[in-house]
Amino acid sequence: MDRGGIILSLDAKEFISKFETFCPLWLAEEGDPCGLHLGTLDKKIERVMMTLDVRPEVVKEAIDKNIDLIIAKHPPIFRPVSRLTADDPQTKMYIDLLKHDIAVYAAHTNMDIIWDGLNDWFCEMLGVNVDNYLVKTHEISFKKLAVYVPIEDSRKMRQALADTGAGMQGNYRNTSYSLVGTGRFTPNAQANPAIGRSDQEEKVQEARIEVVFPETIQEKVLQAMFAVHPYEEPAYDILPLDNPGESFGLGRIGHLDTAVDIEDFVQKVKTTFQLDGLRLVQPKKAKQKVQNIAICGGSAGKFYPEAIKSCADVYITGDVNYHTAHDMQS
């Protein structure tokens, strides 16, 4: 099975940093072990494999194809491992991965929750226009960073901040504002200035760069700012914002352009996801025409009350247990 090997050449940390800008770890639900599971990111990578689960056959394929990094939907290690032995198929996978220097990174519920993530892809495949999330999980407040930097360093600073995920506002990325002015300072005898001399006033043409960022990445934003700023003591402000925050949630609520027969929609789901069969749980008074759709990947049967509240005609999920199915029919 071809699991979508990608050939590239770049630093693994840089690759994951860019990935987490799109799909941040702070969106993962509590207790969900997302992130790096095995190996190291202190290396160059050329081949990346995407997979749903890390299983022995996946590991063998990764070894055969000289894969450097596996990005998995489901974390391979959910519980602490007490011993690593080759006679256990599960732990032998870990041994083989480490032996062949294959890193494993998991993006689980954060990939389910992020806008333009997995549930949005499902909706796009089925022709569902997304209106909202199904179950709210996060409400994120924003802050603003204003940093003063010599004009010749402003482009480098804007890029470094954008790489952390700062400047993301709705459907727009890399947003910032710059204002040019004059910075004044006098280094003392103990200073080691990048510009100017001790005990002499210095004037520098500087840009004030402003970016908005979610409060969850403040430390990352500041680390990036300090890393590229040429000054020994950068001047900057962090401002709290009273603007409405951004909400995130599991699942999606949406609608089809036109209502369709339930049988036709079921067939479309089977065809789209290449299913041999699926389970249809249908109340006696269910609508025969459907248009409002709720969807949540994975085992999300417990969220069917939210689907009902959203006035969905159909709720699609990966797994529904026996008793929940009976509740749905009642």
Task: Give, region by region, the residue ranges found by the protein language model.
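Hydrophobic structural segments
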Residues: 2-330
